Amino acid sequence: APDLITKLNHNLPFAINPPAIDNDYPQSRIFAVFQFMTKEVFIVAAARTPMGSFNGALSSVPATQLGAIAIKGALEKAGIDPNLVNEVFMGCVLQAGVGQAPARQASKFAGIGDHVPATTINKVCASGLKSVALGAQSIMLGLNDIVVAGGMENMSLTPHYLPNSRTGYRYGHVQALDGIVQDGLTDAYDKSLMGTCAELCAKEMNFSREEQDNYAIQSYT
């Protein structure tokens, strides 16, 4: 173990001080605690597309293209060359019909090179913010210097599903599942709708509708 500590200290930019070994317990081992000096993280620019209505003016634009527009806009505002981006995290919940690797598509359409890792995050409503958190953490740990993080969605292009189409339909009516309801707005366990969850949260936290509306207005003013 001392040789291992010496070797690690030789190769790492910080020293490891091993804790004392409890000789009363033969199974005890040395546990090295790595203390990283984390970097500060800054959001240097942000961009978004207009918030379109359902089946509105932007309804025919795929989520990946919307994401690309926002990525390109943010990079231009920050004055950052797309080739300097180290990694991309993009949230996307309704991925059916979008195509493989949505984050990769948005990244590529925005002019970021194929050599840059791009990861799609699905944490339902928190997908975009989780992407930002993952990007920040990667910078804090020294894994990246420049990260693109955000979210993209087009509910209007989300398809309906025919679950039994591969085995064939015979006699009778065929029921289609709405991809928005199935994968985006329904709890997978108790089948409650997300709108219900929002109402319960507002009631529990004592948020009035006026307060919610005023907060929402801040996002586009």
Spans of features found by a protein language model:
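Intrinsically disordered, low-complexity serine/threonine-rich segments
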Residues: 17, 31-34, 85, 128
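Short glycine-rich phosphate-binding loop at a beta-alpha junction
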Residues: 86-91
